[in-house]
Amino acid sequence: MPTKNENLNIFFAASPLHLICINEFRKERNINKYKLILFLHKGNSHALQQMFLTLKELGFKKYTIFWIPKNKFLKYLSEIFLIIKLKFKSSKRNLLFLIIDFRNIFMQSLRRYFMNAEFILIDDGFYTFVAHEYF
């Protein structure tokens, strides 16, 4: 049974740039124990190939793949089950989440369900172009 002082680091990635940011963060903070969750779509084989090549290049050996369903209702249910699973595994631990998209509803819901956790947003820089055009 985990103790209250035990840390649990949960990292999310959906692109090779996220993996690079996670790797830099992990090295900077000297984090060896973590849970890496990949958000992937089955439809784009080239993107999947790039993710797996980046995982191999950076030395990530342990990770969980969360396949994103195309159906929005199934996606919602899958995300709820993931939150429940994380809730059970994280009881009595200090949590740190590396989230990948501040505009993502799932990432925001994590903040509601894990109020005492630390959240750090990693930025792959893609929204900069959208924000520049919009604002």
Model feature map: region roles:
Residues L8-F135:
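Active-site and donor-binding regions of nucleotide-sugar-utilizing enzymes
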